[in-house]
A protein has these predicted regions:
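Short, flexible loop/turn elements at secondary-structure junctions
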Residues: 5, 9, 63, 80-83, ...
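Short amphipathic alpha-helical interaction elements and helix-loop-helix interfaces
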Residues: 14, 65, 85, 109-113, ...
């Protein structure tokens, strides 16, 4: 298990403190997730110390359970993007928690040929799929400075070259994002967003409904590359059973990484 904090993992929701601005509430805030929510069972070693800072960390795991040291590995870079979503805490206006600075430095670290990076977060970059005027990152500076800097990292060829995929949720919709090179328009990184188990969905505070679903990714454990995913959907209007729908496949989409 590789835990990532969500925007409802605080009370009140959406409020994550920034150590750079100080104030009440930050001291030992993230420690409590390790101690009281038992995340220390999964976030260990140096990753634990990173997490205590502001809820982000990276951790490298083998692609399969084995005693061999030469097995391919996945470096999970786990972000706390909840910082940028309706956060009521006083935030640094440029880079709350120095997370983007840390992300850039982490992606600059050299990788061996057998290691791939998967970036994981809850709140995704970009705009809400059903409302092109609603940027998901909305604080600080209305989210624009954060979203632009975030995008610049993954549009950069050298920084994104080792990133196999980015995985997010939050929007309760099955959708995706693409980061294109600003000059060549080449797709540098892909973001995959799974729908939600809960049927709740709100657009401008108006309740809507979605069919609950679960996504199961498959990957090549020899190369550490995500190959495909199955989307399992439970239609709310169905009287019996669960309908299994695998509607994004290599045979249909042509490529998992670039649509």
């Amino acid at each position: 298990m590789v835990p990532a904090l969500g925007n409802h993992d605080t009370f009140k929701a959406d409020n994550y403190p920034d150590f750079k601005t100080g104030g009440s509430g930050h001291e030992n805030f993230y420690d409590k997730y390790l101690e009281e929510a038992a995340l220390a069972d999964f976030i260990t070693g140096d990753a634990k110390e990173m997490f205590k800072k502001c809820g982000y960390y990276h951790m490298t795991k083998p692609t399969r359970r084995t005693q061999h040291e030469d097995v391919p590995k996945i470096k999970f870079v786990v972000l706390n993007t909840n910082l940028y979503y309706h956060n009521q805490y006083d935030l640094d206006p440029v880079d709350p928690c120095d997370q983007l600075k840390w992300l850039r430095a982490t992606l600059e670290e050299p990788l061996d040929n057998s290691t791939r990076v998967i970036v994981v977060g809850h709140v995704p970059p970009g705009f809400f799929a059903r409302d092109s005027y609603n940027m998901v990152f909305n604080v600080p500076c209305n989210g624009e400075c954060i979203n632009d800097e975030f995008a610049s990292i993954f549009r950069n060829k050298s920084l994104s070259s080792g990133v196999a995929a980015q995985l997010y949720g939050h929007d309760h919709l099955d959708t995706f994002r693409l980061f294109r090179d600003e000059v060549s328009e080449t797709v540098r990184s892909s973001v995959f967003m799974a729908a939600s188990v809960t049927p709740a969905l709100y657009l401008n505070n108006v309740p809507m409904g979605v069919n609950p679903s679960v996504r199961i990714y498959s990957y090549d454990d020899e190369r550490g590359i995500i190959m495909d995913y199955d989307q399992v959907i439970c239609p709310m209007k169905a009287v019996y059973g669960i309908i299994y729908s695998t509607y994004i496949q290599n045979s249909q989409a042509g490529s998992f990484t670039v649509f």
